[in-house]
């Protein structure tokens, strides 16, 4: 494509390839570079908040609500609002962030927003104010993840993306259990040990999580270098003025690239289902009356299961291809949704659900991130990942809204969960119709 008002790409494709962190022939393909490790570490930091959001925060929010409050619908609408804000902001900011030096600035701003709001949740708030602060923290998290995902193309090569992305999710799952276990021990043992109330211990867990998040973000902040970019700092103003025209050009380029467009549509639907299952599993279990302790421990098991399974998924992608493994995960998620809707009634079934989700959750997320990175232009990575995020977050709006609305209208949370299967079925059709552009080539996509 031809970008309107686009500054000259810096560096050139040849220079970018020379600067990209390639692996030397002497280095084992099984070893990771320091930059790859420091990129992975951020997943360890932010995943602590993700896990707390899945297991503890919905339960705490439910305790703040009136007795007749419906946490499933309230939580669904909260997730919808957070996703909508990110979906609107990311394509615009993503285009600007492709300017040299801007990506790390936007990343830092959203990261700090997430951390500060995570600490703010520790304040004595009513249920509505608490959910508003949580929405702001979620916006900070998801905004930082958009720029973090796009950093993958600056961190490793096409051939290693599946592996590095999978390791990011894997170590995020296992690493996040450390502060989570500390927080759970504090919540359940703090009242007897320190004489604090359970509420005070829960609030303290928010601060612990924020500190962990900060500690594991510092390595990335101090080491990241933007290899692929479209303008030097002196050309930033011109690039920003052309942002809206560039967004239109990028969208037209995505539409023109049929394999990429087909994948984006499939991604829109299946990541919607995945994110909805993740964000609403605990609130669904709570609504069914499952004990909070059982919910928390079961979700902790998910993290431990997801660690090896994410790494295994990355290895299988090297053998069978990323798209094949993504398709397999979509089929698996359809089975998971049917299980949750028809069979999940007690703690035992929730444990089974947690294990099943752990087997496929990290794999489908990691391979989606790396597969997309292989088929887009590297010098426009943040702009393209902005659209990746708008597809993902807009999808999340639909998924959580669908579950929340269906549950509210029918009064049956199981029917709301079952609606997720429709999204997965549509995604499966588009995946099966898509021609895999990575087959027989390891070259990155280029801008027409």
Regions found by a protein language model. Name each.
Residues 88-102, 308-322, 407:
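Helix-to-loop junctions at the C-terminal end of transmembrane segments
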Residues 27-83, 259-298:
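Helix-loop boundary and gating motifs at the non-cytosolic
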Residues 187-211, 405-424:
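A membrane-interface helix-boundary motif in multi-pass transporters
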Residues 23-36, 224-264:
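Juxtamembrane intracellular "pre-TM" segments in multi-pass secondary transporters
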Residues 117, 128-144, 349-363:
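Hydrophobic core of transmembrane alpha-helices in multi-pass small-molecule transporters
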């Amino acid at each position: 494509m031809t970008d309107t008002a686009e500054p000259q790409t810096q560096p050139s494709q040849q220079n970018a390839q020379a600067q990209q962190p390639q692996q030397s022939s002497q280095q084992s393909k099984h070893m990771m570079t320091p930059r790859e490790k420091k990129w992975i570490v951020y997943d360890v930091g932010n995943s602590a908040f993700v896990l707390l959001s899945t297991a503890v925060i919905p339960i705490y929010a439910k305790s703040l609500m009136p007795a007749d409050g419906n946490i499933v619908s309230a939580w669904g609408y909260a997730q919808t609002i957070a996703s909508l804000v990110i979906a609107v902001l990311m394509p615009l900011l993503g285009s600007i962030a492709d300017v040299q030096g801007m990506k790390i600035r936007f990343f830092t701003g959203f990261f700090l927003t997430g951390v500060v709001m995570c600490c703010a949740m520790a304040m004595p708030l009513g249920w509505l104010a608490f959910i508003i602060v949580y929405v702001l923290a979620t916006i900070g998290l998801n905004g930082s993840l958009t720029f973090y995902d796009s950093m993958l193309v600056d961190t490793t090569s096409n051939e290693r993306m599946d592996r590095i992305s999978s390791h990011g999710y894997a170590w995020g799952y296992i690493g996040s259990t450390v502060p989570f276990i500390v927080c759970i021990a504090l919540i359940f043992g703090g009242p007897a040990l320190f004489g604090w109330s359970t509420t005070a211990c829960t609030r303290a867990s928010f601060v612990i999580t924020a500190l962990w998040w900060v500690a594991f973000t510092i390595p990335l902040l101090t080491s990241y270098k933007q290899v692929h970019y479209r303008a030097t700092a002196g050309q930033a103003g011109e690039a920003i003025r052309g942002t809206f025209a560039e967004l239109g050009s990028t969208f037209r380029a995505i539409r023109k690239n049929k394999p990429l467009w087909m994948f984006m549509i499939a991604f829109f639907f299946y990541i919607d289902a995945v994110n909805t299952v993740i964000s609403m599993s605990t609130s669904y279990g709570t609504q069914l009356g499952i004990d909070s302790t059982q919910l928390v421990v079961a979700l902790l098991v998910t993290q431990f299961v997801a660690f090896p399974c994410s790494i295994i998924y990355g290895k299988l992608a090297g053998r069978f291809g990323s798209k094949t493994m993504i398709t397999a995960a979509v089929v698996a998620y359809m089975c998971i949704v049917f299980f949750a809707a028809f069979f999940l009634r007690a703690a035992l079934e929730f444990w089974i659900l947690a294990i099943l989700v752990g087997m496929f959750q990290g794999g489908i997320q990691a391979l989606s991130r790396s597969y997309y990175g292989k088929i887009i232009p590297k010098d426009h990575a943040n702009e393209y990942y902005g659209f990746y995020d708008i597809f993902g977050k807009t999808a999340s709006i639909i998924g959580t809204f669908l579950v929340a609305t269906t549950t509210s209208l029918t009064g049956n949370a199981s029917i709301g969960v079952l609606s997720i299967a429709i999204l997965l079925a549509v995604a499966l059709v588009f995946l099966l119709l898509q021609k895999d552009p990575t087959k027989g080539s390891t070259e990155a996509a280029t801008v027409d």
